[in-house]
Amino acid sequence: MLPPNSRLVVALLSLSALVGLADTASAQDKLDRALREGQRSGKAQRVILKAKPGYDAWARKLLEQRGKNVDAELPSVGGFAVELAAGELEAYCHASVFDGCSEDSIVRPTAAPAKKKPSQTPAPNKVINTAPATNAVYSAPAVSTLLGTLGLTAYDFGGSGVTVALIDSGIHPSPAFGNRIKAFYDFTNGRIRQRTASDDYGHGTHVAGLIGGRQYLQDAEFQCVAPSVNFVGLKVLDRNGAGRTSDVIRAIEFAIANKALFKIDIINLSLGHPIFEPAATDPLVRAVEKASKAGIIVVVSAGNHGVGKDGEIGFAGTTSPGNAPSALTVGASDHKATITRDDDRVAVYSSNGPTWYDGFVKPDFVAPGHFLASEAAPQGALFKTYPQLRKRGKSGKDFMQLSGTSMSTGVVSGVVALLKQATNHKHFMLTPNLAKGVLQYTAIPLEDEAGNVYNPLRQGTGGVNALGAGTLVTNIDTTVSSPNQAWLNMAPVTVIGHQQYLWSKNIVWGDNIVWGETIYYNLPIWALNIVWGDNIVWGDNIVWGDDADNIVWGNDDNIVWGNNIVWGDNIVWGDNIVWGNNIVWGDHLLRPVDALNRAFNDDNIVWGNLDDDNIVWGNNDDDNIVWGNDDNIVWGNIAALLGGRGSW
């Protein structure tokens, strides 16, 4: 074996050969979809070069020798953000020190302008433009319907002692946040600067207000979820609401490195970009997984790409990092400004699963995100550009009403803060796995207008039930330390608005399912070191490992896992199914619906080649939905639906 210095020299000397002699086929394999498409333009591209494990120093030297300016080093993913000319791309990506290349993609927030009043239900595929007049005085309801529908009208915790790292456009230092913005750093323009809190766009301020803006109905117009929570503001979006993936990764790395200093418990990511590669190689997903392994609960928006230009419901529109297995991926629901859940619907724009390439079931759950009032940044671009979305309170204070999975993500971050305080009070750790499991298990399944339960690709396990989740974690018996012992015993129901709602009692995780009363037991699956993609959990049985030939679970004769899977009478998975390329799921597990929320008659959904460029939206006249055989895929352009404004 060559000594390290000799190997470095060999690597450097070999680069000149690599530049001219890259194997096109293998180099193409190392490029994500965005880079492959970008090559056609012939323009230089911002790239994240991913070094092989242990090759970081070699990669850095190689780039220095070639005179490449490294815009950002990303140690959590072994990445180097650089700009490469079109002719250099394949050579660098093919270099032996690199595992692959990803585009340093533009990330954007996942909010969309609210254009209709929540009390109105437009006809299918239609949007009614009923935005109130600019600065119309908003009459607040006697009780916050947001808190009411979450079951939080009389909750004991407010998120005290919990810190949320808000990775967004910033936070306007409104009195609503008091002295609870503990630190603020700006990651835009390739630098990290400590600054006074600010927000020149306005998106982050709105999300922060939903999480923990201390506003009460007697002196303002809305109520947040966790009024005592602290913030660390990490600005990655500029005044136009755009940022770079590398800046988001640096902010995540900062949160991990400073977790103890700022006591960071939660990261809120109400932003993303289209999925261009499998989760295992996606730099943004890998950074999220690092944060989760560090014990930080990462709450991520699913995206606003759930409907096509013509109003047809589309699937596989989840954005990155919403495809991160450990992330709490949140879709949006419309709670119709009522407390009860019977009229709640999945917001039409909310992105649906499965995730591109991997076929993960996302979102994990949905939460109110439609037409929500929150703090405004008066000097921000949103406030200035969309005056029709301003609402003036009786006190004369202006705020904004926005919609999107950005908003629902903020709501869930607030709920997680409440759970975190509750578990701190009980002296046990709320791990990312346990947080997701509790929220999924206690979620209340939503139904469409016809009374049909939405399938998991649209709502995960259902609408977040803060009261149920809080009740569950506060009733855990912390004296139970032995694995497999029951640590709680309670009825799986929650009363909201004087009505009783059953919990989902399901946990859908990647391509695995937890079913039954598993959450009631102190199990290793809730620990930090468990990667759910490798495990199957069903009822009271746990079998670890990747070998499908040796896994059998359940007490019923009709459940067997081997080379072939027979799941009840409804689903058959055999050797002909290749995850990541073709997937067939029976309709009793996933009920696909068309644009009119009608269930398809066919027994399955088929996904074609997931490496293709596009999504083929559902056809009302077809018996199934097929993705991936055509070049006419549209990545969730809802500009037409929103009157030409596009998504935020």
Question: What is each residue range found by the language model?
Answer:
Residues V10-G20:
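Bacterial N-terminal signal peptides
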Residues D168, T318-S413, A417, G468, ...:
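Extracellular S/T/G-rich loop segment that most often corresponds to the catalytic His/Ser-adjacent loop
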